[in-house]
Every structure is written in structure tokens, then in C-alpha cells.
């Protein structure tokens, strides 16, 4: 049954009623059920749903249910994000406004609570409780109040911001609202100083931006390629950068700068100058806080260039102030290290060069800046001429003039000018860096003037540092600037350049220099000598260089005249190359545009598919949520019913009174039932303990009371016994008197009624006479009816008993019949089982007998094969000797130059035959005759003549020796019938002697080439491929004089084919149509007459149809024919289709 759902209007009205009676949770549940219902999604407009949504969010804010508010907002977004975006925006802004108002109210309440606490007792401000709390937790009263009152609302407001950002991040119509909420979240973090939330917010926004960049062409409607989206993201990141700087989160500020640079690089439109100026200003501030003076000065220089070029209304004072800032920041850059390769030995994630390159990219520089390059750029931009006289002197003293004795005094005057001038407050952070650079300049200049100097003298020259700072700077100069300095603490002196074997690198430091160090002079003396000698040669031979130049000029002119024509043609050809290149580039551009169009089309198609998939996933997600909501609603309903049921009992009310509404919602029905049972058990235990204690108490009091009551009871019983005796005596006396009076009244009444006896007797006699006749008449009627009913019941009883006896007889008869049938069925089943068992035993006996016969036959055949092999070897030897003798005779009588004999009509020549003069050869087991190319085989008749091969006798069917039909498909007779057959049927050879019956055939001495050629052609009857394979496997001679192909016996050495397994017969069984054709051919063969089984010993191979038969064929008996028909009708495995091997 479907669950009852309310309409939105009714739900809103009912929620207001719940709010009025002080049940906001019930009101929120009522509205939530409406939102969970899917029926209203597209059935009502925003004018109906929007007030309900505001009330829903108001209740969520009041109860601090941010997760329930998130669910409702997502449902509202899915409904109205494509219909009415303004309604969605109003709802979200209203929700955040309510959350902010409650948070501000909580903050005011917390401050008021602290004020009340502080003004509670003016005479005793530091109470013991406040002192202990401050010592334990280190917090003041305001912090504790904020944690208890303000912090829950701050958390709720933070969750609200995160939910709204997650809600609007993929909606292209709400981009402006998304960025406004992001700025509101930044203001929230600034107002309440939430640094951890600010970091999480930055990560969240960065993740959203990455998702937009990755999936701009897939599932989201927000595209980073749009100019409006890029500008909104850029403004948000700039606001993020300002907020991070205000909160002093420099790491987040740097990440924001990276995001801003990426967005500016992605944008096709150049950012406005105001944005770039703000970017460089914030970047310079971040670098300054990071302590990177080099990139700080580079950022200020970029800002100065941008302001100078694009700001038209820049005043002279502003320009002078900016120039002084840039110049002082550049001069404050520490002197570069002479050993930058030392950083390679420090393990870090990235090398300093990679980091510098990354920072240079943020400034738009092709390569990382250096102090020297920045000073050159400052001079190129004429910055020293734009600043005041003091700062211009500062540049000259540090970078131009060489005056180490007065350097620190001069710089101190500039430092005093910066510190005393209120307009120079922006330059104060550079004072310490400027002093360090001045000390390093002083040390370098002193090292070029003095070989050694006293420590006190150097301290006098470096007036703004003490001995420890000076020693530290000396060590740093040796470590980083590759200077030769040795400190002698014993003599309190400093030595410069004492080791002449060491010198500086080829890299020379910037700044003013008077002369080279002694070690540098020794290192470069060869270079100086080369320079001097070159100058001397030019003075001694002033015309040599001029003559060399004239000669070189003439060579160049002559070479030009040689190649000017080729060069002219090359220049003309270059124009054609340029045109071809332009055409090629144009084609490439067209192809690229087409490819881009195809790619965009493919991307749009993929985007549509992805959008469709997303919609399907959202639909599935909505269905899943709907299902979950329904399950949750059912659970809540059952929970409510369970709570209502429990609340009707006293212990249930007591248990529910201990839980609030939140606790009840967190429990399910089982947990509530469990708590109810626990409450019952606890109450039972408490009652039992109370009863036990009460029992002890009552027992004590009762025993004490009984002890005290015993004398009182004894006195009372004695008095009561006396009173009872007196009362009994009085009562007994009264009773006796009353009995006597009653007796006297009864006797008087009896005497008075005795005179009425005669009248009574007369009345009874008259009544008996009157009623006697009526009684007799009724008695007669009753007896008649009784007799009729007795007869009727007797007749019915006779009929019923007769029918029962008949039914019992029929039932007994039917049971007897069924019993007999069951006995017959059981007897038949027993007979069938016995017959089946007998047949099985008979088959097993036959199989065993057949197996023994097969083994015996196999042994005989193996013996016969052995004998045949011996005969074959003997015959081969005889043939070999005969062939040698014949060859000798032919060599003796061969005519000189005569032609060879021509081939016979049969296609077999004398050269091929190479046989003895006698053309007849007999072999065991059959007869084979070859004569002039004709080939006749008897015993399964086979004739070949002149390249033609004919097989007769039912397609190469062979006659059996046992007198039966020799067809290769015969009925399998039992062993008893085969045993009963006559042993000698007039056949010339028995089955044991004829080893080829059912096994291998006779050895064939056939011609190799002729037979192979004949076998390749079509056959008249059927394919003889398997037979040729069998002939080849028998290992017979291909020619009369040729060697045997193989001497291995056949894998199956013959034997009775009836002994073979039946499954092979069934596999080789041919279709019925082929069997019918074979039967027809056998019938035709029988009509023509059986072929002779053995040819005459001197027969010449005449017509085989006219050849006389050597033995009579016994016709098949009628019984066998009938049995054969029966077997053909039902093929139960006794008929097989075995190929003779």
C-alpha cells in the first residue's frame, strides 16, 4: 500500500502548527517528508515550493541541521537550476544570511556573557575558580565562552558555506553566486580568524578549478575557456591572495599566485594593467616575506616598468618614490655566491635552479634574474637619475666608487636619512640588508688594498656592526664568495690573499675594483704576457695587418665573382620556395582547422554522451536516494509507532523521559525495545531490592509488635471470654423462650385447620374422575404412533444393513483383484529381472569367449605374418639373384644402338617390370596375376588393366572362407552359430590359413609411378584413398624389383572383425542411402554371378565375368534372410559398417 503524502501547502501549514506548539523537530520532519517525495518535483512551481523551502531552511538553521539543509538544497537545485535560477539564488542567499545572523547573535551573546561574568563582583575580581581555570587550560573567560556558545554556530556557518560551494560548482548559471559565496567564506575566515578552515577552503577551490579544467568538455556546464569564467576565477583568486596576506598565510598566498598566473596564461585576453599591478605588488610582498630579496626586487622592477609605461597621470613624486623603492630593493640584494654548485650536494625535492626558473615564470622572465642583471636593468631604465640625490649617491658609493675608508660612514648617513624620514617608512625593511651588503663591499675593497689589517681597525671602518657580526660576515664571505681570508686571533689580525697558489675563479664579482689580487695576477700572467706581445708585434710591424686584410679582401671579391650567378639564382629560387612554403603552411592550417573541427565535434558528441550518462547516473542516484528515503521513512514511522506504543506504559514514559528528541532519532525500533527491556529489568531489580528491604523492616516491626501485644492480648481474651459467656447465656435464654412460644402457636393453628380435611378429599376425587378419560385417549394415540415409528425404523434398518453388506462385498472383491494384479506385476518384474540378468551373464560369457577367440586368432595371424615375412625375405633374395642373372643375359644379347622395347598396351614396359620370364606369381592367401600391364587379384576380386582400375564383387567385398556371404557388411552371428557351421565348406583354404581375411591383404608388387598416376585420378566406384593408404601401410613392394617401403606390421593385425569393439563400427557406419546403394550393387553382382575366387595357374587374365568359379557359393538360408530383415528393420548394434583393412 502506498504511503500517504501531503501536498506542499498542507505540509507548510502543518509545520507552522508544530512550530507554534514548540515542536520544531516534528515540523522539520513534516517538511522533509515532502522534499523526499518524488511526486512533487515537477508538479508545483517555485511560487509554491519557495516559501516551503525558506521555512525548511529556517528550521535547519534553528536546529543546526546542516546535513538536512544540504539534502533539501540539492533537491531544490535539481528542480530549479534550469527553470528559475533566481529562485535558487534567493534561497541560497537567504539560507546563508540566516546562518550569519545566528552566528553574529551567538558572538554577541558570548561577549555579553563574559561582560556579565566580569561585572559580577567588582570587589572580588580574581575568584578562585577563575584562577584555577586560567592555570589549568590557559584560556580566559572569553575563550571559554566562545567555545561553548559561539563555536557551534561558527561550525554550522562553515559547513553551510562548504555545502553551497559544492552545490554550485558545476552550474554555469550560478557562477557569479558561486564566487560571491567564496568571497563570503574568505570574509568569514578573516572575521573569526579561522586559519585551518581557510587552508581547507583554498584546497577546495583549487580542486574545483582543477575539475573544471579537466572536465570542461564532459560533464560540467562550466567551461574554463569562457572569458567571463576566467575573469570570475581571477577575481576570486586575487581576493584569496589579499585574504591570505591579511591572515599571514604565505604558503596559501604563494599557491594563489600560481593559480593567478595560470589563469592569466590561459586567458586569451591580456589582463588589465590594474590587475597586473596588483599581482606584481602582492607577489613582491610574498617574496619579501619569504626572504627572497632577489625576486622581490625583480617584482618591484616589473611593477615600476608597468606603472611607468601605462599610468599616464603619474606624478613626479610618485615616480621618484617608486624609483627609490626599486633602487634600494635592488641594492639590498645580497652578493651572489661564488659556489652555487654547493647546492647540488644538498638533498631537496627540487634543485635551486628549477625553483628559480619556476619563480621567474611567475614574473614573466625568460630566465632567472641575477643581481648584476637587475642593476643593469635599473641603469637602463634610468632609475638612478629619477631618485633623489641621497639615493643616487648610495648607488654610486656601492656600485661605482672605490673608497673603503669612508664607505660605511657614507652608508650610515643614508640609513639615518631613511630612519628619520616619515615618508621613507616603506624603505625601513631594507636597512639591515643594505648594511650587510655594505660590509661585504668593504671586505672586498679592503682585501684589494691591504694584505693584513687589525681587527680593531676593521671594526672602526665597519661602524654599524660588532665583532661577532663582523667575524660571521668574514666567514660567510670565505664560504660563499671564494675570498682568501685568514683570521689570526692571537695577533688579532686579518690576512687577505696570502696563498698565491689559489686564486679566484674566472667569474669576477660585480662592483668597483682597484686591482687584482696577487693570486689572480699569478694565475693570469700568461694571458697578460700574450696581450703585451700581441701589442708589441702590432707596433713593430704596423703594415702586416693591413696587408693581410687587403689580401683577404681580394680573395673575397674574387670568390664573389665566381659564385654571384649561382647566388643570384638561389635568391630567385628562394621566392618560389617561400611561395611553396606558404602554400604548405596554408594546407597544414586548413588540415589543422578541419582536424580541430572534427575534434570539437567529437568532443561535443562525447560531451553529449557524457551528459546523458551523467543524467542517467543522477537519475539512478535519485532513485537510490528515494529508495533510501522511503526505507528511512518506514523506519522512522515504525520508530514513531514503537515510541508511541512504549509511551503508553509507565516504564516506557519513564524511559523516554531520559532521552531527548535527538537521542530518540538516533535509535531504531530494536534499540528502543532493547532499552525498554533493560528499563523493565532494572525496575524489576530495583523493586525486588526494595521489597527485600521492606520485608526485613516489616518482619522486624511485626515481631516486635507481636511481642509487645502478647500480654495485652491475654488480658483482652480473658475479659472477652467472660463477656462472651454472659452474652451466650442471655441469648440462649431468649432463644428457648421464643421456641416455646412458636410451638404453642403452631399447635393452635393445626387444631384450627383439621375441620377442612373432608372438603379437600371430595375435591381430589372429582378431579381424578374428570382427568382419567382424557388420559386413556392420549395413551392410545401415543401407543399407535409408537408402533408406526417402530416399524418404519425397522424397515430402514433392514435396507441400510443390506446396502452395507453389498458395499463390503464389492470392496473385498476389488481389493482381491488389486492384490492379484500386484502379485502378477511383481512376478513379471521378477521374471524380467531374472531374464535381464541371464542375458547379461550370457553376453558376458559370449564376450569372454569372443575375446579368447580373438586372442587365439591374433596369435595365429602374428605367426602367419612372421612366416610371410620370412617368405618375403626369401623371395626378395631369389628375385635379386634372378634379376642379376637376367641383367647379365641382357647385357650379353642387347643389340647395339637399338631402341628400347616399347611400352605394352597396359602402360607397363619391360624396363619397368624387370621380372622373370614367367609372368605368373602366386602368393599365400589369394592369387595375383600381372600380365603385360594387366593386373588381376583374386579373393575379393580386383582387376587393373592399362591404367584402368576396376573392382568388382560388391565394391571390393571379399568372400569369407566359412561358406557364408563374403560381403563386408554381414550380420553378426552368435558364437554358437559360427561354431555350428561346417569346418570344411569346400574352400581351398581355412580361416586360419587365410590370414588376410579381416586383416592385411596380400603383398602387392605394383608399379610405383603408374599406380600413383592412376590413384590420382577419379575412381569408377568410390574413392580408394583409404585403401591405398592401407596398401602402403602393409609394406608391400611397389615394384617387382623395388625395396619394401616399410617392414612394420600393420597396427591392427587383422583377426575376426566381429571381435572388434562396437563403438568403432558405429563410428564408421555409413548412411542408409549408401547402404541401400551397396545392397543394390551386391544384388547386381549376385545376378551377374559370383566372380572366380582363384584364377587358374596359367590363366592369361581374360574377361573376369567369364572366368569359371572354383567353388560353389552357398545361398543364404531363409531363416538367415528373415533374421537379416529383422536386424535391418531394427538396428540394435548387431549390424555394423566395418571397413575391411
Curated annotation (Swiss-Prot):
The modification Phosphoserine is found at residue 908. Residues 588-623, 829-899, 920-976, 990-1051, 1059-1087, 1110-1131 have a biased composition (Basic and acidic residues). GO terms for cellular component: eukaryotic 43S preinitiation complex; eukaryotic 48S preinitiation complex; eukaryotic translation initiation factor 3 complex; eukaryotic translation initiation factor 3 complex, eIF3e; eukaryotic translation initiation factor 3 complex, eIF3m; multi-eIF complex. It is found in: Cytoplasm. Residues 588-631, 829-1141 are annotated as: Disordered. It comes from the Eukaryota. This is Eukaryotic translation initiation factor 3 subunit A. It comes from Drosophila sechellia. The gene is eIF3a.
Amino acid at each position: 500500500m502506498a504511503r500517504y503524502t501531503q501536498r506542499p501547502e498542507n505540509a507548510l501549514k502543518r509545520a507552522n502548527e508544530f512550530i507554534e506548539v514548540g515542536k520544531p523537530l516534528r515540523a522539520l520532519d513534516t517538511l522533509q517528508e515532502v522534499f523526499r517525495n518524488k511526486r512533487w518535483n515537477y508538479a508545483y512551481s517555485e511560487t509554491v515550493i519557495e516559501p516551503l523551502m525558506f521555512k525548511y531552511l529556517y528550521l535547519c538553521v534553528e536546529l543546526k541541521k546542516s546535513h538536512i539543509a544540504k539534502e533539501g538544497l540539492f533537491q531544490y537545485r535539481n528542480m530549479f537550476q534550469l527553470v528559475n535560477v533566481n529562485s535558487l539564488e534567493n534561497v541560497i542567499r537567504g539560507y546563508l544570511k540566516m546562518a550569519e545572523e545566528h552566528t553574529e547573535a551567538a558572538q554577541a551573546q558570548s561577549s555579553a556573557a563574559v561582560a556579565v561574568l566580569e561585572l559580577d563582583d567588582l570587589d572580588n575580581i580574581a575568584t578562585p575558580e577563575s584562577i584555577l581555570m586560567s592555570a589549568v587550560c590557559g584560556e580566559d573567560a572569553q575563550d571559554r565562552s566562545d567555545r561553548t556558545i559561539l563555536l557551534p554556530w561558527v561550525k554550522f556557518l562553515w559547513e553551510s558555506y562548504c555545502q553551497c560551494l559544492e552545490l554550485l560548482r558545476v552550474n554555469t548559471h550560478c557562477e557569479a553566486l558561486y564566487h560571491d559565496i567564496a568571497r563570503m567564506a574568505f570574509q568569514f575566515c578573516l572575521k573569526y580568524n579561522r586559519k585551518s578552515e581557510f587552508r581547507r577552503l583554498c584546497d577546495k577551490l583549487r580542486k574545483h578549478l582543477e575539475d573544471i579544467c579537466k572536465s570542461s568538455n564532459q560533464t560540467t556546464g562550466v567551461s574554463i575557456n569562457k572569458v567571463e569564467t576566467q575573469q570570475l576565477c581571477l577575481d576570486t583568486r586575487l581576493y584569496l591572495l589579499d585574504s591570505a596576506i591579511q591572515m599571514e598565510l604565505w604558503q596559501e598566498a604563494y599557491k594563489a599566485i600560481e593559480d593567478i598566473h595560470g589563469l592569466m596564461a590561459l586567458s586569451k585576453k591580456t589582463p588589465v594593467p590594474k590587475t597586473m599591478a596588483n599581482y606584481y605588488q602582492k607577489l613582491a610582498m610574498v617574496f619579501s616575506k619569504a626572504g627572497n630579496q632577489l625576486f622581490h626586487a625583480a617584482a618591484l622592477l616589473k611593477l615600476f616598468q608597468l606603472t611607468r609605461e601605462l599610468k599616464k597621470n603619474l606624478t613626479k613624486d610618485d615616480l621618484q618614490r617608486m624609483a627609490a623603492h626599486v633602487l634600494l630593493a635592488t641594492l639590498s640584494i645580497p652578493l651572489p655566491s661564488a659556489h652555487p654548485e654547493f647546492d647540488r650536494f644538498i638533498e631537496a625535492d627540487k634543485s635551486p635552479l628549477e625553483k628559480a626558473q619556476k619563480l621567474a615564470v611567475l614574473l614573466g622572465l625568460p630566465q632567472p634574474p641575477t643581481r648584476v642583471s637587475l642593476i643593469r636593468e635599473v641603469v637602463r631604465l634610468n632609475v638612478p637619475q629619477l631618485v633623489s640625490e641621497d639615493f643616487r649617491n648610495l648607488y654610486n658609493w656601492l656600485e661605482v666608487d672605490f673608497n673603503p675608508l669612508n664607505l660605511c660612514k657614507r652608508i650610515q648617513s643614508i640609513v639615518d636619512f631613511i630612519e628619520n624620514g616619515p615618508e621613507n617608512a616603506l624603505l625601513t625593511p631594507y636597512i639591515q640588508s643594505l648594511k650587510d651588503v655594505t660590509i661585504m663591499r668593504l671586505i672586498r675593497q679592503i682585501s684589494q688594498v691591504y694584505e693584513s689589517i687589525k681587527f680593531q681597525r676593521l671594526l672602526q671602518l665597519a661602524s654599524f656592526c660588532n665583532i661577532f657580526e663582523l667575524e660571521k660576515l668574514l666567514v660567510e664571505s670565505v664560504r660563499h664568495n671564494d675570498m682568501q681570508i685568514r683570521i689570526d686571533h692571537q695577533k688579532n689580525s686579518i690576512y687577505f690573499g696570502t696563498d698565491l697558489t689559489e686564486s679566484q675563479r674566472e667569474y669576477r664579482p660585480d662592483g668597483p675594483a682597484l686591482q687584482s689580487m696577487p693570486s689572480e695576477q699569478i694565475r693570469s700572467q700568461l694571458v697578460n704576457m700574450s696581450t703585451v706581445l700581441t701589442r708589441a708585434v702590432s707596433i713593430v710591424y704596423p703594415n702586416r695587418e693591413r696587408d693581410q686584410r687587403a689580401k683577404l679582401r681580394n680573395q673575397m671579391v674574387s670568390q664573389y665573382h665566381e659564385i654571384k650567378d649561382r647566388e643570384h639564382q638561389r635568391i630567385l629560387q628562394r621566392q618560389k620556395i617561400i611561395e611553396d612554403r606558404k602554400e604548405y603552411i596554408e594546407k597544414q592550417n586548413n588540415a589543422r582547422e578541419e582536424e580541430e573541427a572534427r575534434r570539437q565535434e567529437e568532443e561535443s558528441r562525447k560531451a553529449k554522451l557524457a551528459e546523458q550518462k551523467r543524467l542517467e547516473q543522477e537519475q539512478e542516484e535519485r532513485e537510490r536516494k528515494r529508495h533510501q528515503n522511503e526505507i528511512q521513512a518506514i523506519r522512522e514511522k515504525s520508530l514513531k509507532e514503537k515510541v508511541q506504543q512504549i509511551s503508553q506504559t509507565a516504564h516506557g514514559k519513564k524511559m523516554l523521559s531520559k532521552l531527548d528528541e535527538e537521542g530518540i532519532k538516533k535509535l531504531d525500533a530494536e534499540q528502543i525495545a532493547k532499552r525498554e527491556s533493560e528499563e523493565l529489568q532494572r525496575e524489576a531489580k530495583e523493586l525486588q531490592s526494595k521489597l527485600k528491604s521492606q520485608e526485613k523492616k516489616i518482619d522486624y516491626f511485626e515481631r516486635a509488635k507481636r511481642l509487645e501485644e502478647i500480654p495485652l492480648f491475654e488480658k483482652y481474651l480473658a475479659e472477652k471470654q467472660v463477656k462472651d459467656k454472659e452474652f451466650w447465656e442471655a441469648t440462649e435464654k431468649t432463644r428457648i423462650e421464643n421456641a416455646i412460644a412458636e410451638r404453642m402457636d403452631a399447635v393452635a393453628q393445626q387444631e384450627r385447620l383439621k375441620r377442612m380435611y373432608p372438603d379437600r378429599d371430595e375435591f381430589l376425587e372429582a378431579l381424578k374422575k374428570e382427568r382419567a378419560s382424557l388420559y386413556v385417549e392420549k395413551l392410545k394415540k401415543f401407543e399407535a404412533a409408537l408402533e408406526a415409528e417402530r416399524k418404519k425404523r425397522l424397515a430402514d434398518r433392514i435396507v441400510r444393513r443390506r446396502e452395507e453388506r453389498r458395499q463390503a462385498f464389492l470392496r473385498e472383491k476389488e481389493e482381491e483383484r488389486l492384490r492379484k494384479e500386484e502379485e502378477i506385476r511383481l512376478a513379471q518384474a521378477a521374471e524380467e529381472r531374472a531374464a535381464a540378468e541371464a542375458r547379461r551373464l550370457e553376453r558376458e560369457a559370449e564376450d569372454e569367449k569372443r575375446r579368447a577367440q580373438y586372442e587365439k586368432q591374433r596369435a595365429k595371424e602374428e605367426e602367419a605374418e612372421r612366416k610371410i615375412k620370412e617368405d618375403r625375405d626369401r623371395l626378395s633374395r631369389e628375385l635379386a639373384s634372378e634379376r642379376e642373372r637376367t641383367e647379365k643375359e641382357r647385357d650379353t644379347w642387347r643389340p647395339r644402338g637399338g631402341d628400347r622395347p616399347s611400352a605394352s598396351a597396359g602402360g607397363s614396359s619391360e624396363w619397368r617390370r624387370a621380372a622373370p620370364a614367367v609372368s605368373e606369381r602366386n602368393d599365400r592367401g589369394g592369387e595375383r596375376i600381372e600380365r603385360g600391364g594387366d593386373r588381376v587379384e583374386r579373393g575379393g576380386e580386383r582387376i587393373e588393366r592399362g591404367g584402368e582400375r576396376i573392382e568388382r564383387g560388391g565394391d571390393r567385398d571379399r568372400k569369407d572362407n566359412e561358406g557364408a556371404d563374403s560381403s563386408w557388411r554381414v550380420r553378426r552371428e552368435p558364437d554358437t552359430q559360427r561354431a555350428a557351421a561346417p569346418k570344411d565348406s569346400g574352400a581351398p583354404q581355412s580361416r586360419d590359413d587365410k590370414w588376410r581375411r579381416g586383416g592385411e591383404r596380400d603383398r602387392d608388387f605394383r608399379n610405383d609411378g603408374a599406380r600413383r598416376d592412376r590413384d590420382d585420378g577419379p575412381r569408377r566406384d568410390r574413392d580408394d584413398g583409404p585403401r591405398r593408404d592401407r596398401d602402403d601401410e602393409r609394406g608391400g613392394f611397389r615394384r617387382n624389383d623395388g625395396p619394401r617401403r616399410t617392414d612394420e606390421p600393420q597396427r591392427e593385425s587383422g583377426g575376426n572383425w566381429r571381435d572388434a569393439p562396437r563403438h568403432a563400427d558405429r563410428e564408421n557406419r555409413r548412411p542408409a542411402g549408401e547402404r541401400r546403394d551397396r545392397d543394390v550393387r551386391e544384388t547386381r553382382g549376385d545376378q551377374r554371378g559370383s566372380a572366380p575366387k582363384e584364377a587358374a595357374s596359367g590363366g592369361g587374365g581374360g574377361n573376369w565375368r567369364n572366368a569359371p568359379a572354383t567353388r560353389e557359393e552357398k545361398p543364404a538360408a531363409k531363416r538367415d534372410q528373415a533374421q537379416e530383415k529383422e536386424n535391418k528393420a531394427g538396428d540394435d548394434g548387431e549390424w555394423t559398417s566395418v571397413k575391411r583393412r
